[in-house]
Structure formats: structure tokens, C-alpha cells
Amino acid sequence: MDNIQTFIKESDDFKSIINGLHEGLKEQLLAGLSGSARSVFTSALANETNKPIFLITHNLYQAQKVTDDLTSLLEDRSVLLYPVNELISSEIAVASPELRAQRLDVINRLTNGEAPIVVAPVAAIRRMLPPVEVWKSSQMLIQVGHDIEPDQLASRLVEVGYERSDMVSAPGEFSIRGGIIDIYPLTSENPVRIELFDTEVDSIRSFNSDDQRSIETLTSINIGPAKELIIRPEEKARAMEKIDSGLAASLKKLKADKQKEILHANISHDKERLSEGQTDQELVKYLSYFYEKPASLLDYTPDNTLLILDEVSRIHEMEEQLQKEEAEFITNLLEEGKILHDIRLSFSFQKIVAEQKRPLLYYSLFLRHVHHTSPQNIVNVSGRQMQSFHGQMNVLAGEMERFKKSNFTVVFLGANKERTQKLSSVLADYDIEAAMTDSKKALVQGQVYIMEGELQSGFELPLMKLAVITEEELFKNRVKKKPRKQKLTNAERIKSYSELQIGDYVVHINHGIGKYLGIETLEINGIHKDYLNIHYQGSDKLYVPVEQIDQVQKYVGSEGKEPKLYKLGGSEWKRVKKKVETSVQDIADDLIKLYAEREASKGYAFSPDHEMQREFESAFPYQETEDQLRSIHEIKKDMERERPMDRLLCGDVGYGKTEVAIRAAFKAIGDGKQVALLVPTTILAQQHYETIKERFQDYPINIGLLSRFRTRKEANETIKGLKNGTVDIVIGTHRLLSKDVVYKDLGLLIIDEEQRFGVTHKEKIKQIKANVDVLTLTATPIPRTLHMSMLGVRDLSVIETPPENRFPVQTYVVEYNGALVREAIERELARGGQVYFLYNRVEDIERKADEISMLVPDAKVAYAHGKMTENELETVMLSFLEGESDVLVSTTIIETGVDIPNVNTLIVFDADKMGLSQLYQLRGRVGRSNRVAYAYFTYRRDKVLTEVAEKRLQAIKEFTELGSGFKIAMRDLTIRGAGNLLGAQQHGFIDSVGFDLYSQMLKEAIEERKGDTAKTEQFETEIDVELDAYIPETYIQDGKQKIDMYKRFRSVATIEEKNELQDEMIDRFGNYPKEVEYLFTVAEMKVYARQERVELIKQDKDAVRLTISEEASAEIDGQKLFELGNQYGRQIGLGMEGKKLKISIQTKGRSADEWLDTVLGMLKGLKDVKKQTISST
């Protein structure tokens, strides 16, 4: 927005600051500006001086806002945010990697000599970092043609925070497989694969972490640290020495033996972890021991950097608060015997600033003296925030009149092209003339403009006669930005949950549930093969050859339930399977009957979209996700058909289901039909009512609400309106199902969370459903597999992508302590937010709420639990929703439904006792707005955790690191979804055979009834040849990857797929050995054999025999087959067995490669030996 900056640059105030910089003044103060006006001033300084700028704010939230502004204003400069959580205790907790990746990116860019604009909260400056030279020496440049010693590289990677794994799927991991090294730098979008020829780097390629395939070839790669803690051998030795002397000094200060014992045990444990080479977060507390002189972030910035302190008095207040919190935190750790007495955790911000040689510029809203500052130049700018118009255009028109009289230049900003056009038409409606312009064109004094651009807030600068108005002031709702691309996209795409781990339960289709013990290579009659080793009841074991891998599935049942192992060869599994089969057949019958009824019934076919519909949709202030757009398209297509719609729309709370439903409602109202939206609770009704009222405000649509919050008079008016057709859309609880509610012409029924209505209500819903279009919304994920099997029974649309929001929820797993809770709550309240405190024990929830009130006396604390009456619960929730209470202590009832964007901190008590899926859903309750949200999963101090709880906490830790926890959560939710869809009684059946087998059985039963069985049966060839065809341990070590590859071999259906798999294996694992080559040969044989319907390829003592199916044999021309065989001389024998052709190929005295060539040659040639069919003309 260069043209807005020009106004600032031409002012005397700006020139005064620039002169001060030229004259070498150490400190200057700029007062009077706030919000985005400050950002415009900063961007003008950046452009004018062309110097790097380091801007410090009081907290992270403010730093984000400033970063967003500067990114919009400075298109040609890189603006970086250095995000640090202000809570000192969270520093040493296990934390999510996204913010760390951003911090590392900033440090790497600074050490590589870039001169960006960096924005950081004061907490970032207090933080200790490795000295700059240590960081620089930790950068590794790897180039093609250079030599690398894999073991040395592995040691260095571990020193700088990387973790070794079997397969690289998340940032911060590396793996070494023979001459192939995969590394996922934290600051790269994709991981890299380095291939060695002996020790020389032969090639470097980036690859996709999902399918592990290469993307592009590189000539070099710079690998920076994966953590901010770098521990080389010399640092380790220094720290060990200091820990020993610190421990001796601390033990002297303690009186009680018990205390000494605890301290000694804890510190010894830390030393052990340090000597093992661990670099986890908990060792961060020893940072001052590792380095002679730790660095601050400012030490990394170029010498000519201009330092700006944004609202300097607030920064000093925050510094005091941080010092106080840190002192309390250290006191707590000292009491617990977890820290030494002389440890420093951070720098003093004031001291660092005082030591700076660089020029300082202070921003302050008011002109006043601030402690610790002595500015030599003070500039007071006349400026004010733009007032909010909240859609009241008559107020804006009055303001515009004032601007015109004073000869102001006015700029309206719209987020994108569509928004600027919308702005133009809105202003024209109120006779406000505005010219379209862009940020490069000069502005003429006294004119009104519309321009594409985004700022956090508008402002007015009276002396410069400039006013900037954003959509934030014009309309109530803020337009969401398209975020800057996150670096961690690939890590979030998580592999299918069906991957097998050793110790998992599995289901064999013929033998039942067993425990998977790994993959083993066995030698039988001199032939090597890989087998899955499955343990059954007692000491029974089953070895399943990998070619039968599709008969084994991972067992997925309800979370926390251990399945029973079956006895091999027993009849119990057959009995259980039979029972489930019968139940599945019944369900399939019901579903097919339902399907036939739906197809036969006649409804109303809505007309295609018209201009008004398109206009209504373009007024949506956010960016739709692809899933939203697809769902909208599917729903409209259904509505335009004559058959009544029955569609389920699935998506988590806050994923944008409501907007999809609103568009469907608008379409129905456009055709003169009425719409009813049925919701389970009064609060949800209220929320939907507010949303719909706001979305429909520019259209002549009459909206009714029927709930406990309406007076009798209001309710009667709505009921009357529904009967005579004056009410177009009604939102209501089960009150809508009462006998007195009659519609003139209902066209669309929208049901939110149908599973939360009781049986009697569901019956009434069925009656209304009969001939109207029905859209059901649910937040419980419905499994895709089940959806496939139910295709055509109930249509399903799924919204799986969350709305684009810049910051993922920062998740911490940490011991519970009062100081942490107080800090987290106070921090959230300080930024105007609210807190969920999850406490899952109804009996003493009141006591817990009182405890929190005592911890944070300023907070208004409320509590809610499931044993309250519906009315009590709704009253509490409503007052929380309206901001009358700050902290809600609640049981898991907050899992569902109500969306409160202002809640951005979640604290979970006893997280180890909760299901992963619950934790995942709870975590989804925060982080709905454009702020960083925090989730603290706490467990009780010094509690011995059960093995299950420990595993669960481990999984939560993994899922803070974007690991597999997400998959487990989705899996459990999926099962719940299945239960909801099919009825609760199915839960037991799903558990008894596992979810995947159940889905498969249901799918087959439905296809059988639809007559689709012929389509699903594929011709299978059985191949039994004596070849060492397997994946040796030396080629792929990891069992999971082996299984994955065997599955891929099994699914090869064409020669193209075989070739692709060959390329992929060479790409991922290097050149393959003979044993793997034989696997490819067998796969190729199978492709041709299937095409020519060869039933069996079997090797006996001296030949390989091919048996061709009866139908295929009948099509073969004997003469042509004889000629084909002659090409191979005496090695081929031909004969018939009944009506089936048999071909035998000699193996005696020939190498495997020779007879394989002949087998392949004969199989390929079969397509050319068919009888000619003479077409009749």
C-alpha cells in the first residue's frame, strides 16, 4: 500500500524521526498513533531506511496482528513472526512443533545473512538461545559430489535435535537405510532423500512424505537444527560438570533427608537422559549450563537493525509479570526437587535493551514519561482509531460528509477483488462515490477510493487529512484472511490408521482375532518366504503367507476394550461370524427396502440457482473450503431432483456446516417453500437464529424462533405465520414437533444432531420427513468405508477440512500445578478471552470451581455438568456464551454442539483418564478464531500412571507432534458414528468382528441384494512356484513398510502399475536384489494370467503347469497355440484335462530365469491365439 505510506512519508512528524536516525540519536519516542496506523508508519520507515527492523510487542497476540498488517503493507520485504508462548512452564513441557518450526525459520534466515523485518513478543527476547557461532556451526550443507559418513551424519543430526525413525513422515525426523538417507528439516515443506554411492552423494531429491515418492532433483540442501537446544559433546561435558557442582551446592542448602533424596533422584534422572543424547524440552531448564554465554534473539540480528518497542509501558508491565511468574515457577520446581538453586531460566529484558548499541524507537499511545527510557526526540502525531459503523450506513454517510468538508482523502479497503466490488455496490446504494484504485497509484487529495488490501483496523490522521476504513469497521464480521502457507502441511496428512504395529490385534477372515507379532522370513523346502506371525489363544500361532495379506485386517473396536483371542481350529469364531452375518443381512434388507421406498416417492423438484442465489452466496464473508463447495453442490443437485432429498452432512463444529445449510434454506425459500431447522437445545437454536438473521438481513425473509426463550405471544405469532405462510423459516427445539405446529408449504427440513433426539421425537421427525427434502447435520464423523457400503441408501456429504486459520492449537502435556493454571487463565483473560476447564467428576466439581476462584480471584467462574436439569444447564451455558462468566468448569458435555469462538484456552484435569477421541474432540472446541489457542492436558503430580494411561499420554504427546494420535481419535469417533448410523444394537456386533470386517460384510450383503455381485468378483489366478520371491531384511528392515509393499504387490493389476511400483521401490530403497526382482516377475505373471483367465500356475518336480479356465480354453485356436509352443521347442507340452487346456513348461536342467522367461512368453502370447470371430454383416 505504497500510496498510503506516501501520505505518512511527506509529513513533518515522519521526517523528524528519519532525521533523528540520520543524526544517530539513540532513543526516540513516537506518541499518538495506535493500531494499524502504527503499522503503516513502521512500513514507511522500512521502505525509507531500507534497514532491517526488529519490532517488540508485549504479547504474542499483538505480535500476530502487527505481523499480519506489515505483511499486507510490505509486499517486497519478508516479514517474520517469532512466536513464543509467554508461559514459562510451557517451555519445558512437551509442545506442538508448529511454533517451533516458525522460530527456527527466523533464526536460520538471520544466521544466513537475511535482513528481514522480525516481530516478536517480549518473552522471545528474554529467552536464552545457543550462541550464534554454535548455531552457525550446526548448519549442514550437503552437496552432490561431496563425501558423507552416514554414522557421523546421524550423530550430528541427533545433536541438533533430529530423531531417528524407520520412515520419515514428520518434520524433525531422519532415517538411514543402507545408502539412502531421508531427512525432514523443520523449515522445509518436504523432506529430502540423499542417495550415496559408497560415501559420495550421488543425488539429492525432495520427496512427498505421504507416498514417499520423489518430487524434484536438487543439487544441494542446507539442513538447520530441529530444536533450539543444540548439545554437542563439549556442551554436554560442560553441563554435566555444572550440574554436579550445582547439585552439591543445592544439597548443602537442604535440611530434610527426604528432600535431598528427591532432588538427587530427579537430577540424576536428568543427567541420565542427557548422557543418552536426548534433547527433549525438559532439558531446556539447563540452557544456562550448556553455553559459556547464551545468546538472546537480538544477538542474531544484523548490526544496523532498528529496534522498535511497540507500546513501551505495556512491554515493561509484561516483563514484570513474566519475572513474577518465573520466580513462582522456580519456587514450585524447588519444592518438588526438580531444579537446582543457581539456575537462570531467562534474561532480563531491560538489561538487554540497556546494553543495545542500536537505535531505539518507542511507540506510545499517550505522551507521558515511561520508566527506563530517555528519548532525545519526542514526536506527537495527531491520530485516532476509526469508529465502528456496524452496518449502519446512514452513520457512515454523515461521517463521509464531514470528511468531504475537511478535504480528506478517504480509502476503503476490501480483502480481495470480490470484496472491493461488493464495497463499491454497497457505497453506491448510499450515494457515496468512490473510485477503484490499486496500491501503486498516487492518491489525489480530497478524493474517495476503494482499494484491495487488508489491515487490522482503520484510522484517521487529521493533520495529514487521511482516513482509512476497513471492513472491520463497516460490517460486524471480519473477513478471514487466506493464511500464509504453513510449512508443516505434509506432516498433517496422516497415514491410514490401518497400518499394523507389532502387538496390534488383527482379524483373520477364517480364524478370528489374534495378536500380530511381526513379519518373519521362513525357509520351507529350501524356499524363502515372508509370513505374518499371529498369536492366538494359548500358545497357538498362525503363519500367514504375505500373498494372503488381504485376509488379515487390523482389529478396530471400541476404544479401551481389549478383544478376546480365539482358539485356532475352534468353532467359536465361525459361530460369532454367522451371528454377525445374520444381523448384517437384516440391516441390508432394511436399507434396501428404505432405498426402494425413497426411489419410488415423489417430492418437489426445486428450480436451478438464479441470480439472487448467486448474489446471496457471494456475500459470504469467508473463504469457503473445497469440502464446503462440494457439499453445497451435492445438496443442490439433490434438491433439484424430484425424489425427496435425504442427505447427511458431516463435519466438526466450526467446520462450516451451518453456511451450507443456510444456502440450501435460501434456495428453498426462493421457490416459495418454507424451511424448518430443528435443533436439540435452546442455546443452539439461539445461535442458529442469530447467524441466520445476520445472513438474511438484506433480504425480505421472515424468520421465526420457537424455543424456551420466546414469550407465549411471540411463539403464537410464529405458529400462526407458519400456518398462513408468512414465516419463511423457523428455527426451533422439539417444540417444532408439537401438534399445534402446522406448515402451509414445508419444502426443506434441516435437522441438527439427530442422534440427540429421543425415540418419540425421532418418530415424529419420520412423519414430517415423508415427502419433504431433509438435510441432517452431524458433528460425529461418519466413516467413509461405511458410507461406501450405504451408497444410495442415505446420501452423505463430508466436510473434513477445517476453515483456514493460521494457527493450530498449541498443545501441551504437563503435570498439573496451581501456578500453571493461574497463569494460563490470567493470560487468556488479559486478551479478553474465556477458558474451558475440563473436570470430569460431578461429585466434587463445585469444590474444583471454588479452588479455581481462589487461584484467580478476578475471574468469574461457573460450572456445568450432565446431572443438571436441561434448564439449569442452558442458563449456565448461555451466560458463558454471552461472556458473563470467564471460566467454565465442566464435565465432557462441552464436547458437542455449542460454538464459542471466544474460548481459546482449554485445561484438562486428569487427561490420562480420558479417551483419545474425547481429547481430540475437546481440543477442537478451542482455536475457532484468529488467535493462537492453547490446550493444556494435565496429569497429577507424581502419580504412578497405569500402563494404559501412560500409553494414552504418550499418544497425546505424539498427537501434539502431529503423530498417530489423530488417527486413533478418528478411528474411535468413526466407530461411534457407525453406531449412530446403524443403531446402537450394532455396537456389539462391530466389536465382536472388528470394524473393517463388519463394513466389508455389510457391503457384500447390500451388493448381493442390489444384484451387484457379478461386478465385484474379479478373476483370480493362483500362483504356486518355487522361487525365493520375498523382501529380504537387508533391503527393507522395517516390518510396517514391508507389509505396505507386499500389499502394493498384491494390488498390482496392470503392467503400468507394476512399472510404477518398480520406480517407487528404486526411488525409496535403492536398487533391489534378485529376491525382489522375482516378486515383480510373479506380479507380471499374475497380470497376464488374469487377462487370459489362467486359473492356476503350479510348479511340481520338473515343470510349471498352466491351467486355463473352461471359458478361455473354448476360445483358443489349437493350431495357433501349437505354433506359439513351437517357438520354445521341446520345453512346451500341451494337453487337455476335461474341458480345460493345460500347458506344461520344462524346468529340469534350466535356471529359474530361463523357465520364467518361457512362462511369461507363453502368457503374453495367449492373447494372439484366440479363434477369430466372424461378424455378421
UniProtKB/Swiss-Prot annotation:
EC number(s) given by UniProt: 3.6.4.-
PROSITE patterns for this protein: HELICASE_ATP_BIND_1, HELICASE_CTER
GO biological process entries: regulation of DNA-templated transcription; transcription-coupled nucleotide-excision repair, DNA damage recognition
UniProt entry tagged with the keyword Oxidoreductase: no
Keywords: ATP-binding, Cytoplasm, DNA damage, DNA repair, DNA-binding, Helicase, Hydrolase, Nucleotide-binding
Extent of motif DEEQ box: 752-755
Keyword rRNA-binding: no
Record domain Helicase C-terminal: where: 820-974
SMART domains per the UniProt record, alphabetical: CarD_TRCF, DEXDc, HELICc, TRCF
SUPFAM superfamilies, alphabetized: CarD-like, P-loop containing nucleoside triphosphate hydrolases, TRCF domain-like
Gene Ontology CC entries for this record: cytoplasm
Domain annotation Helicase ATP-binding: ranges: 638-799
Leading EC class: hydrolase
A Pfam family that the UniProt record links to this protein: CarD_TRCF_RID
GO molecular function: ATP binding; damaged DNA binding; DNA binding; DNA translocase activity; helicase activity; hydrolase activity; RNA polymerase core enzyme binding
Subcellular location: Cytoplasm
Disruption phenotype: No visible phenotype. An mfd deletion suppresses the lethality of pcrA DNA helicase depletion and increases survival of the strain in the presence of H(2)O(2) but not methyl methanesulfonate, although the surviving cells are very small.
Function recorded in the entry: Couples transcription and DNA repair by recognizing RNA polymerase (RNAP) stalled at DNA lesions. Mediates ATP-dependent release of RNAP and its truncated transcript from the DNA, and recruitment of nucleotide excision repair machinery to the damaged site. Probably required to repair non-bulky DNA lesions.
Family: In the N-terminal section; belongs to the UvrB family.
Protein name: Transcription-repair-coupling factor
Organism: Bacillus subtilis (strain 168)
